[in-house]
Amino acid sequence: HCRHKIFNAEWEIDNIKEEKSLFDLIKDTSKKNSRELISAYKDNSAVIKGTREKVLEPSNDNLYLEKEYELNSIIKVETHNHPTAISPFPGAATGSGGEIRDEGATGTGAKPKFGIVGFNVSNLRVNEKNDWEKTLLLPNRIASPIQIMIEAPIGAASFNNEFGRPCTLGYFRVLETAFINNRAFGYHKPIMLAGGIGTIKSRDSLKGVITENFLIVVIGGPSMLIGLGGGAASSMSSGESDESLDYASVQRDNAEMERRCQEVINSCTCKDENIIKFIHDVGAGGLSNAIPELANDTNLGIEIDFNAIPVADKNMTPMEIWCNESQERYVLAIGENDLEDFKSICKRERCPFSVVGKTVNEKSIKLIDGPTSHVDVPLGMLFGDLPKTKIKTVTKDTKEFETLEPKIDLENDLELVLRHPSVSSKQFLITIGDRSVGGLTVRDQMIGRYQVPTSNYALSSSSFISKRGEVAAIGEKPQIAIFNPSASLR
């Protein structure tokens, strides 16, 4: 849902205009090694070519059968930093929840398999401060690092647990430098990283092609006055926006509703012909973003019956109904002849749904409320070539590490290093989550008979029958990136 105004910005460094944006540099990796890549940077997650596998799946007659498909892998990583900084538990929970929805809304429907969670924060200042920890200066609305690390991991683990997805990979980094020449580095605004791996059938790996008169359906919970303006708030520097707007922008999680939606998606993709022809999840910007996205991607327009949008709070204004970011919703396009079948699936899974509109040939978004039209805008106004952000900067010499003093207390210093959160055991972040739910986990974080949390990777099986699967690992070195970004990547 992001327009990436920073990553797509035009950069001028030392009075020299850069040819590529940051996003261009990111995409270079896939351009140079795209052999097994089916889709990247154009859907809700990336799709990587897989293998032919046997799976257990219900037939059209609702009997479990052994079927064989070309199964591809999907991968997604994003961050949910601003909400986690403002309200750690719901911020991290909806970060994981939003990433799960992105996986499910890939192509014409996919299955999330295992999760990835990471945290970067400044010094924790647990009880008494350590010698290297200075006084923490934060805006009142920003949670402290220790508060974030007490609440946010529970939020992420809670959502993964309730949804029914194992979280078998992650990292935790504490970094905050001292001031040198009035500059310091740290994570007062944290990084909350949410990612995951899933599977998708080859036939479902790309979005479908639809025409006019396809039905637009919203599945999931009703509209509530939750998460208003989160897409804008997350793009501001911390402390820039109004404090009340900051808190209003944080979404609230409902993992059970998301599980119901995922079961509907799974049931649709089990059919001999997938009922879902197009799907997007509802995230930042709410329906005001998701529905125009669907219209733009299908090269069509959409007419919406405003009264058909499910609403829990009748006092909400049209703007609030259209723009709220109530979680656990998806927007789908289905054929009119599939509606009864779709209704029966939603009823069985107890998943709320509503047919809110249809596709039209005129490339515009119309919100119709009886004789009144709240919104009638051409897609070109929403998705046209927007002016790019221009950023000027200069390179600065970075002070190298100071050499260690010859007189060191090895035993004391070793203890300080080993108890530093970036070095010490991460077991407290691991055992809060179910690592085997779903039955496809092959390698989680725990190793050996004593279950020591030292695994370097996560591994899952493609199916209950297969001996092949997906492996993922993650690495980060911000303390080196401060001085040598290239070395930190190597």
Spans of features found by a protein language model:
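Glycine/proline-enriched, intrinsically flexible loops and inter-domain linkers
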Residues: H1-R490
